[in-house]
From Swiss-Prot:
Molecular function, one GO term: squalene synthase [NAD(P)H] activity
UniProt-listed PANTHER family: BIFUNCTIONAL LYCOPENE CYCLASE/PHYTOENE SYNTHASE (PTHR31480)
Protein name in the entry: Phytoene synthase 1, chloroplastic
Alphabetical keyword list: Carotenoid biosynthesis, Chloroplast, Isoprene biosynthesis, Plastid, Transferase, Transit peptide
EC number: 2.5.1.32
Pathway(s): Carotenoid biosynthesis; phytoene biosynthesis; all-trans-phytoene from geranylgeranyl diphosphate: step 1/1
Induction comment: By fruit ripening.
Species for this entry: Solanum lycopersicum
Function: Catalyzes the reaction from prephytoene diphosphate to phytoene.
InterPro entries: Isoprenoid_synthase_dom_sf (IPR008949), Squ/phyt_synthse (IPR002060), Squalene/phytoene_synthase_CS (IPR019845), Trans_IPPS_bact-type (IPR044843), Trans_IPPS_HH (IPR033904)
CC per GO annotation: chloroplast
One of the GO biological process terms: carotenoid biosynthetic process
Subunit structure: Monomer. Interacts with SGR1.
Family: Belongs to the phytoene/squalene synthase family.
């Protein structure tokens, strides 16, 4: 199941060539050895000055679930996720109260033959250029500091996704994900393991990025290992938050909120969350056939039953009137999340709006393509053609030029 790696990633940008994890799974090789054989040291990077994360206390959305004596939840997934949103917004607001300026620290030398941290960021940029072409193009309009930080986050998200969705996914165990999370803790505490971790460690020391969304994304990978069905949309929403909504929360501190924006910080975070959810719902609707061939159904079981459908109908891959009616409702829901996301994109800093608008406009067009395919997402994979991208991207750029609203009911 593909996940929305970043709320700024556009569809159809992932190369069909060599797997990303073929080149980074060991952490000390960045591309295949014939191209970059000895660029990176095998030594562990140790760097001081890292910040502590949540006073060493781990927290996950799952741990916030309140249960009755009968074991039933008393909070919806949206309520639980909103608690995380408030925490991320509070972190950014603390920085905004002190200064609106980004303090850029000098490059920190990395042991080994790589030399400078800036080279590690450059490697992250090469990955983005190879695997997310439209996204990488959009980042060129961002300030150098924000661009490098987004590259670093993109690479970490991609590595995390490849753990359960890459060629070695069958060998990944919960214990392996636990080790990956421990390594994440080291990154946030200034003890990166390799050059890619080093870029992320520097990023989180320069921007008010909290560790929680990263932990929650790993929790989403755990969910993929143990779960292949979702009883209702509440369960599916939580999964979408874990694997995609988290990326929006990671990205807002990097993208930045426009100084002239009158929107609340929470509303901007909610929009980022909504875009992640919308992108992931779109992935799910696009990949129904592909997921079914892997024995997975990422659709609410109760809604399938209400439509007179079952897993067997999905595995059979027949487009019926019942399926069309069901899909129309699912697409309508995804578009509602895109509509919610639009409310916050304009409030971002001017240099950061275009890649986000590009993601929103292009991903939403995938839903149009599903409709154009007569809802056959069993054997046809909806995608946005190059010609349609060329038409859509100028529209996204024009939208990015629109300044934040002049009035709002709440101040940041």
């Amino acid at each position: 199941m593909s996940v929305a790696l970043l709320w700024v990633v556009s569809p159809c940008d992932v190369s069909n060539g060599t797997s990303f994890m073929e080149s980074v799974r060991e952490g000390n090789r960045f591309f295949d050895s014939s191209r970059h054989r000895n660029l990176v040291s095998n030594e562990r990077i140790n760097r001081g000055g890292g910040k502590q994360t949540n006073n060493g206390r781990k927290f996950s959305v799952r741990s916030a679930i309140l249960a009755t004596p009968s074991g039933e939840r008393t909070m919806t997934s949206e309520q639980m996720v909103y608690d995380v949103v408030l925490r991320q917004a509070a972190l950014v607001k603390r920085q905004l109260r002190s200064t609106n300026e980004l303090e850029v620290k000098p490059d920190i030398p990395i042991p080994g033959n790589l030399g400078l941290l800036s080279e590690a960021y450059d490697r992250c940029g090469e990955v983005c250029a190879e695997y997310a072409k439209t996204f990488n193009l959009g980042t060129m309009l961002m300030t150098p500091e924000r661009r490098r930080a987004i590259w670093a986050i993109y690479v970490w998200c991609r590595r995390t996704d490849e753990l359960v969705d890459g060629p070695n996914a069958s060998y990944i165990t919960p214990a392996a994900l636990d080790r990956w999370e421990n390594r994440l803790e080291d990154v946030f505490n200034g003890r990166p393991f390799d050059m890619l971790d080093g870029a992320l460690s520097d990023t989180v020391s320069n921007f008010p990025v909290d560790i929680q969304p990263f932990r929650d994304m790993i929790e989403g990978m755990r969910m993929d290992l143990r779960k292949s069905r979702y009883k209702n949309f509440d369960e599916l929403y939580l999964y979408c938050y874990y694997v995609a909504g988290t990326v929006g929360l990671m990205s807002v501190p990097i993208m930045g909120i426009a100084p002239e924006s009158k929107a609340t910080t929470e509303s901007v975070y909610n929009a980022a969350l909504a875009l992640g959810i919308a992108n992931q719902l779109t992935n799910i609707l696009r990949d129904v056939g592909e997921d079914a061939r892997r024995g997975r159904v990422y659709l609410p079981q109760d809604e399938l039953a209400q439509a007179g459908l079952s897993d067997e109908d999905i595995f059979a891959g027949r487009v019926t009137d019942k399926w069309r009616i069901f899909m129309k409702k699912q697409i309508h829901r995804a578009r509602k999340f895109f509509d919610e996301a639009e409310k916050g994109v304009t409030e971002l800093s001017s240099a950061s709006r275009f890649p986000v608008w590009a993601s929103l406009v292009l991903y939403r067009k995938i839903l149009d393509e599903i409709e154009a395919n007569d809802y056959n997402n069993f054997t046809k994979r909806a995608y946005v053609s190059k010609s349609k991208k060329l038409i859509a991207l100028p529209i996204a750029y024009a939208k990015s030029l629109v300044p934040p609203t002049k009035t709002a009911s709440l101040q940041r």
